[in-house]
From Swiss-Prot:
GO terms for cellular component: plasma membrane. Pfam families: DsbB. It is a multi-pass membrane protein. It comes from Bacillus cereus (strain ATCC 14579 / DSM 31 / CCUG 7414 / JCM 2152 / NBRC 15305 / NCIMB 9373 / NCTC 2599 / NRRL B-3711). This is Probable disulfide formation protein C. One of its GO terms (biological process) is protein folding. The keyword Phosphoprotein does not apply. Keywords: Cell membrane, Chaperone, Disulfide bond, Electron transport, Membrane, Oxidoreductase, Redox-active center, Transmembrane, Transmembrane helix, Transport. Belongs to the DsbB family. BdbC subfamily. It comes from the Bacteria. The chain crosses the membrane at residues 8-27, 42-61, 68-85, 113-135. Disulfide bonds join 37-40, 99-104.
């Protein structure tokens, strides 16, 4: 497979991940009526613009976006990892008790004993970061 095709598929995959993450986030808050905590809002702030940015980049085949999406997705992943640690690691849970109106330790979902909303966001951010890295490496 050619370099440009790899870049194209990686960029499209990153956009798809951001689109699915945004739809999932909106589903949980608007349909299921799960109120987001403060850290969830920060994750949304980092995730939602990717749908627009990466969508435009896919349409224009502008692979330069990867230079910007990699660090932004990495920051979002760090926030998600911290939020996940607050939920799952006892040493971090004390920090989440006073997170805001909704405690960051709350787990609206807990599929298979480990998949929570911050975990899903973490997977989305990691997918975007890895795809951005692939785009950069194939320049």
């Amino acid at each position: 497979m050619g370099r440009e095709k790899k870049q194209e598929y990686a960029l499209l995959t990153a956009w798809g991940a951001s689109f699915i993450a945004t739809l999932g986030s909106l589903y949980f808050s608007e349909i299921m009526k799960f109120e987001p905590c403060v850290l969830c809002w920060y994750q949304r702030i980092f995730m939602y613009p990717f749908v627009l940015w990466l969508g435009i980049a896919v349409a224009k085949k502008d692979y330069r976006i990867a230079s910007y999406s990699l660090p932004i997705a990495s920051i979002g992943a760090c926030i998600s990892l911290y939020h996940y640690a607050i939920q799952k690691v006892a040493a971090f849970s004390a920090a989440g008790a006073a997170c805001g109106r909704v405690p960051c330790t709350g787990e609206y979902i807990n599929w298979f004993g480990f998949v929570t909303i911050p975990f899903l966001a973490l997977i989305g951010f990691i997918t975007i970061a890895v795809c951005s890295f692939i785009v950069i490496k194939n320049k």
